[in-house]
Design a protein with these regions (language model features):
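Dynamic "connector" segments at or just before major functional cores
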Residues: 1-116, 128, 135-153
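Short, surface-exposed basic-aromatic patches at helix termini and helix-loop junctions that form
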Residues: 172, 191-200
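Short, surface-exposed connector motifs at secondary-structure boundaries
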Residues: 143, 170-177
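A conserved hydrophobic secondary-structure block that centers on an alpha-helix together
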Residues: 42-46, 167-170, 180-181
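A short acidic (Asp/Glu
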Residues: 111-113, 187-193, 212-215
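An anionic, glycine-rich sequence signature occurring as long contiguous blocks
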Residues: 130-132, 146-149, 197-235
Length: 235
């Protein structure tokens, strides 16, 4: 990971970005330390700072409060940082956009009150915590090349359509985008939108909720190809 970050050579961009803040720490050093710690053991920022960072090869020369300030700074400018890393990845490793993939997910926050961004919205788990939605665009090799966050109370269906087009335009992508979605985004409008833009889609749907005709078709044994694991068992 350290070699990849060094090859991307984005530290100077972090310096430019943090020049507008009166920080007494290096935001890039904190960012890179968090990346390494996340790969070792994905924990909360508190546990990461106290349990993981001291064991890494880089000395910790910043406080926990400074870490939180850096996280707030990077989060507030996340779209610019994503663009910086996307450009650096394209220049140093290449990005394959003949086919791209797009998916949405949610993040929960254990806070008592909502704010303008962390809002209560639909939850498959039935939770009532405020959430933030995330749309992620991946290249053909599953490398993230674009992302968009939005308030958790917004419907993902229109967000899906707008975010895909915005991210494709921003990254100059004219290839085919495959939309990956569960039943929450599985609607006729999204399917038509994908077809109209010559894109594709993989939408899941509950077999129990299918019509009798569709359920019969899904359960047919023909046209399925067995996939075996290393022991010769069907995977």
């Amino acid at each position: 990971l350290a070699n990849i970050l060094n090859t991307l050579d984005v530290e100077e961009h972090f310096g430019y970005m943090q020049s507008t803040r009166d920080f007494h720490f290096n935001a890039y050093d904190i960012f890179s330390s968090l990346v390494f710690a996340r790969a070792v053991s994905p924990l909360s920022k508190h546990k990461t700072f106290h349990d993981i960072l001291p064991s890494l090869f880089k000395p910790v020369d910043f406080s926990y409060d400074q870490l939180l300030d850096a996280v707030e700074f990077i989060g507030s400018e996340y779209e610019k940082f994503v663009e910086i890393f996307t450009v650096a990845t394209r220049e140093n490793f290449g990005i394959e956009t003949k086919h791209t993939y797009f998916d949405c997910t949610n993040f929960y926050f254990e806070i008592d009150k909502e704010n303008r961004f962390q809002r209560k919205g639909p939850s498959k788990e039935g939770r009532h915590d405020p959430i933030v939605g995330l749309g992620l665009l991946l290249d053909s090799n599953m490398i993230p090349i674009g992302m968009k966050m939005y308030p958790g109370n917004e419907s993902e269906k229109p967000v899906l359509r707008k975010t895909i087009q915005d991210l494709k335009k921003q990254n100059n992508i004219d290839g085919r985008t495959i939309q990956i979605a569960d039943k929450g985004l599985n609607c006729a409008r999204n399917i038509l939108e994908a077809i109209d833009h010559c894109d594709g889609y993989i939408f899941s749907k509950s077999v129990k909720q299918l019509s009798e005709t569709e359920r019969t078709w899904v359960l047919l044994e023909n046209d399925y190809t067995p996939v075996y694991d290393g022991s010769g068992e069907i995977d």
